[in-house]
Amino acid sequence: TLLPGSDPFIKPWMIDISDDHYALDISRARALLGWNPRHSLRETLPKMLTALQSDPVEWYRENELHAQTVSDGPAWPHVINMLLGLWLIGTVQALGTIEPSLLWSDLASGAAIILFSMLALRHTWAAWTVCGVGFWLMSAPLLFWASNAAVYNNDLLVGALVVTFAVIAPQLGRDDPGSGAPPGWSYNPSGWMQRLAIVFLAMIGFFLARYLAAFQLGHIVHPWDPFFGEGTRRVLTSDVSKAFPVSDAGLGALSYLLDALAGVIGDVRRWRTMPWMVVLFGLFIIPPGVTSIVLVILQPVGIGDWCTLCLVASVVMLLMVSPALDEVIATGQFLLRARRTGASVWRVFWQGERGAMDEPKIQSRSLLAEMLHSIEAFSAPWNLWLSTMVGVWLMAAPTLLNLVGTTADSTHIVGALVVTVSVVAFAEPARPVRLLNILCGAWLLLAAWIFHGGTPGWPWISIVTGLALIALNIRCGPIEDQYGDWQRVIR
């Protein structure tokens, strides 16, 4: 749009009637009164728009309009951030022992939050700068290896609140009426229920990873594990874990927290109003989801131990991948349409499109049905559930059947891959991914005869498992929703 920010007054029905022009007949005024209009809208409107675009703030001031109510949003979130900056400066030295570098980082961050929050009252870019300071505040305890749990928690909490009040709170309540669904879709992938399901899972993952990080940073002495005893300790102190320059569990906690924050940024049309945020949101979830499974694969193969909380956190991250994919696909379709119409994809990617457009009507659901729909696992077909169970069986087979050597490693790795592929394919838009399980099944047909370390009956068990995996993943399963042009890819 030409106006800065979003205009809450433009509605689709206004666009529909905008072509209904009525030309006034001024011939009698000319003939009887000799009157002619001094200004022409056709000539004046381009000049008005040029003046608005060149200096929006001055244009609003000259015309006695309130630009802040149109673009910047309310002032109270930025005032709260100023108070949070004061809190950070005033409490950092009262929380106990703190590393000098982290102390100066917190003091500088508090001052920066106050300064840029004041600027954010008039400049939108300053709010995003405050957001960046909040991100640094959440990351600093990891970079400086905070030995004080209170300091770490204080920085995490203040950083998350600063991001919330800088860029999330000012946008709340600005959703226009309408479904917000992309063209050809039967639901809105950016709907609040869809995103809140991811936020809920992200917070579960955050608390799990934060607990594991507490052990790595020295905040607790002994990590709790209900099934594998000292396995968690050995995993968290392994060479794989120490290869990271920071606490890998703390890095996971930060990733989960960013997922939760990114999940609530933007309106219900952010698939087209904030494409960059949707892509960033997908990058926060999809690559870490795959990486977490890789780390789980390395536990028994490279370390020789299991970690219960690590497994649960990985499952949580994996469950977040499916509901995040559809929003990324919707944004990809939007950018592709922009390219086909000749628009600058780079500009559209960063600025989005806030103009009114025809939106498909979507089926209304009850709150419970909407919640179940937002979590893909509840609508996954039976064959993918069985494939997941096969993957779990393969991961447990080395222990249950006393497999050793390369046979045990191969079986465990294939099992983890099958679980990953099956859970990702729970999402209808990602259903073609299930075909990778057929390759895993084919590998099982061969691996039992190639590697050594199995029991006498293992080759036949591997063959039966591989054939079952191939058979289960031939079927796509029912596709209940519509996904525009992506429908052809699913089938």
How does the language model describe each region?
Residues G90, G96, S101-S105, W145-A146, ...:
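Membrane-interfacial helix-loop segments of redox and metal-homeostasis proteins
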Residues L2-G34:
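Conserved C-terminal active-site "lid" loop/helix of NAD(P)H-dependent oxidoreductases
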Residues S71-A75, V79, A120, T124, ...:
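Conserved beta-strand/short-helix segments
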Residues V130-L137, N437-L444:
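Central hydrophobic cores of alpha-helical transmembrane segments
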Residues R61-D72, M193, M371, I375:
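N-terminal juxtamembrane segment and adjoining first transmembrane helix
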Residues R28, H39-V70:
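Amphipathic terminal alpha-helices
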